[in-house]
């Protein structure tokens, strides 16, 4: 079973998509299997992250800003602004896909894990995520 979910972002931020993924798994009626998520973009990514304390996500963003600075004169690719190349680098350093086991019709996430779309651009975008469910 496969579907594309569209997520609207508000610019650079992390969007918790756990509920959308769980809903799709529930509708699939798959009790045991795998859920694969793949984002069709090169300036946003998918991560598993702490979901209870928003400071964790803020700290990750602050760390990434220190590692990959917007508008760095080192970058030649600036076609869409000072956040363009940094967004591509951030995407490469994180992940474009996740695979999560399914048991009893639910994602087998840890107690504090959530599934996040990490938008790396300044402006709002609509992002496509391909969700594929494989039955065991």
Predicted regions and their residues:
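Active-site histidine-anchored catalytic micro-motif
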Residues: 1-136
């Amino acid at each position: 079973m496969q579907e594309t979910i569209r997520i609207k972002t508000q610019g650079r931020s992390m969007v918790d998509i756990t509920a959308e993924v769980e809903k799709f798994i529930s509708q699939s009626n798959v009790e045991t299997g795998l859920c694969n998520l793949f984002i069709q973009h090169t300036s946003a990514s998918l991560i598993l992250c702490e979901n209870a304390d928003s400071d964790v996500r803020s700290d990750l963003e602050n760390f990434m800003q220190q590692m990959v600075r917007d508008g760095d004169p080192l970058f030649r690719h600036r076609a869409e602004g000072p956040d363009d190349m940094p967004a591509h680098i951030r995407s490469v350093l994180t992940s474009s896909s996740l695979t999560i086991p399914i048991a009893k019709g639910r994602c087998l996430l840890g107690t504090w894990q959530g599934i996040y779309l990490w938008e790396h651009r300044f402006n709002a975008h609509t992002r496509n995520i391909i969700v594929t469910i494989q039955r065991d």
